[in-house]
Amino acid sequence: MIYWIFLVLAIICEVIGTLSMKYASVSGGYTGMIVMWLMIATSYIFLAIAVKKVALGVAYALWEGIGIVIITTFSVLWFGESLSALKLGGLAMLIAGITLIKSGTKKSVVAKKTTDSVKNIAGKAKQVATVVKGVNKPISSNVKEA
């Protein structure tokens, strides 16, 4: 659970950093650039911690995808950028892609049952091998044939 919190923090820092970059380019001040550098660096640190337990593909897709959706929303609201039907379609496809990637990483019940079955069969095979090995012991040299 803690790793998901780090992923959320990484997304928040990335959004703040990217919006600060836009603010710096519009205002011409250095404050936005300093905030951008700090937030982007912090974002990568949090992302690096998150991927210790969250699948890299999922973490990166969520980090970039959710970040893009939030950044686009605030760019329209704060900076007056346009949002066309084509951009909305792209954002919808992005969200659909993130959903597919996230849902594809869950371990299914079938996979667990298959793994358990393979382990069970391997255990039985080991037992059989032990029995067969005991039956196939060589006849000792001190036993005389009749």
UniProtKB/Swiss-Prot annotation:
<feature type="transmembrane region" description="Helical">
    <location>
        <begin position="76"/>
        <end position="96"/>
    </location>
</feature>
<keyword id="KW-0812">Transmembrane</keyword>
<feature type="transmembrane region" description="Helical">
    <location>
        <begin position="1"/>
        <end position="21"/>
    </location>
</feature>
<keyword id="KW-1003">Cell membrane</keyword>
<protein>
    <recommendedName>
        <fullName>Spermidine export protein MdtJ</fullName>
    </recommendedName>
</protein>
<dbReference type="Pfam" id="PF00893">
    <property type="entry name" value="Multi_Drug_Res"/>
</dbReference>
<comment type="similarity">
    <text>Belongs to the drug/metabolite transporter (DMT) superfamily. Small multidrug resistance (SMR) (TC 2.A.7.1) family. MdtJ subfamily.</text>
</comment>
<keyword id="KW-0813">Transport</keyword>
<dbReference type="GO" id="GO:0031460">
    <property type="term" value="P:glycine betaine transport"/>
</dbReference>
<dbReference type="GO" id="GO:0015199">
    <property type="term" value="F:amino-acid betaine transmembrane transporter activity"/>
</dbReference>
<dbReference type="GO" id="GO:0015297">
    <property type="term" value="F:antiporter activity"/>
</dbReference>
<feature type="transmembrane region" description="Helical">
    <location>
        <begin position="54"/>
        <end position="74"/>
    </location>
</feature>
<comment type="subunit">
    <text>Forms a complex with MdtI.</text>
</comment>
<keyword id="KW-0472">Membrane</keyword>
<comment type="function">
    <text>Catalyzes the excretion of spermidine.</text>
</comment>
<dbReference type="GO" id="GO:0005886">
    <property type="term" value="C:plasma membrane"/>
</dbReference>
<dbReference type="InterPro" id="IPR045324">
    <property type="entry name" value="Small_multidrug_res"/>
</dbReference>
<feature type="transmembrane region" description="Helical">
    <location>
        <begin position="31"/>
        <end position="51"/>
    </location>
</feature>
<keyword id="KW-1133">Transmembrane helix</keyword>
<dbReference type="GO" id="GO:0015606">
    <property type="term" value="F:spermidine transmembrane transporter activity"/>
</dbReference>
<dbReference type="GO" id="GO:0015220">
    <property type="term" value="F:choline transmembrane transporter activity"/>
</dbReference>
<dbReference type="InterPro" id="IPR000390">
    <property type="entry name" value="Small_drug/metabolite_transptr"/>
</dbReference>
<dbReference type="InterPro" id="IPR023740">
    <property type="entry name" value="Spermidine_export_MdtJ"/>
</dbReference>
<keyword id="KW-0997">Cell inner membrane</keyword>
